[in-house]
């Protein structure tokens, strides 16, 4: 196996994600009483499960898991959800609900808690 294969795959994935994000506009303001669901990981993959529920300006995190790399990604230990959407809104997070104890649902919790260590956790 060529060690550069993993780097090329990671670079390709990063390029795809950047091109997707560049074409996204800001979400529309929520109507009063509306609920927004924001998937930050776990779509189209087994792992990295994380969703954020937004309601009346407050955020509830549901799961915060890791994705384990494939053989084509040497040197990568874990793949985390994309926290960038909530990094600037950590003060709006009212809690985190963990649905169960598998790594793909709880493995990234310590990394999120580095952004704000006093988030209440429910399970």
Predicted ranges, named:
Residues 1-38, 54-65:
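Metallo-beta-lactamase
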Residues 43-48, 55-98, 110-119, 123:
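Pre-active-site segment of Zn-dependent metallo-hydrolases
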Residues 105:
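N-terminal Rossmann-fold NAD(P) dinucleotide-binding loop
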């Amino acid at each position: 196996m060529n060690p550069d294969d993993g780097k090329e795959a990671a670079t390709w994935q990063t390029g795809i994600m950047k091109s997707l994000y560049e074409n996204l506009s800001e979400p529309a303001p929520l109507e009063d009483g509306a609920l927004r669901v924001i998937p930050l990981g776990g779509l189209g993959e087994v792992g990295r499960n994380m969703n954020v529920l937004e309601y009346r300006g407050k955020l509830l995190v549901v799961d915060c898991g890791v994705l384990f790399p494939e053989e084509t990604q040497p040197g990568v230990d874990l793949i985390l959800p994309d926290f960038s959407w909530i990094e600037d809104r950590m003060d709006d997070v009212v809690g985190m609900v963990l649905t169960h104890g598998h790594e793909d649902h709880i493995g990234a919790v310590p990394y999120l808690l580095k952004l704000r260590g006093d988030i209440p956790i429910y399970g």
